[in-house]
């Protein structure tokens, strides 16, 4: 005969949720800082093509003035 499993306690559920949210928040912060470094052209940890990068309008106007 099938027996129902024990229910997970609320504290255990909250602990698991907070760890998941913490990891998600950390990865979001890393992605955001990486995007900021690419847009500000200060990235030193990797190479990227300037032709394929999407720049905000302020950077585009500066690059046109330099030419």
UniProtKB/Swiss-Prot annotation:
Subcellular location: Plastid, Chloroplast
Transmembrane segments: none
Pfam families reported in the protein's UniProt record: Ribosomal_L32p
Keyword entries, A-Z: Chloroplast, Plastid, Ribonucleoprotein, Ribosomal protein
One GO BP: translation
UniProt GO cellular component terms: chloroplast; large ribosomal subunit
One MF annotation (Gene Ontology) recorded for this entry: structural constituent of ribosome
Taxonomy, superkingdom: Eukaryota
Main location class: plastid
Alphabetized InterPro entries for the sequence: Ribosomal_bL32, Ribosomal_bL32_plant/cyanobact, Ribosomal_zn-bd
Keyword DNA repair tagged: no
Entries under HAMAP family matching the protein: Ribosomal_bL32
Family membership noted in the UniProt record: Belongs to the bacterial ribosomal protein bL32 family.
Protein name, UniProt field: Large ribosomal subunit protein bL32c
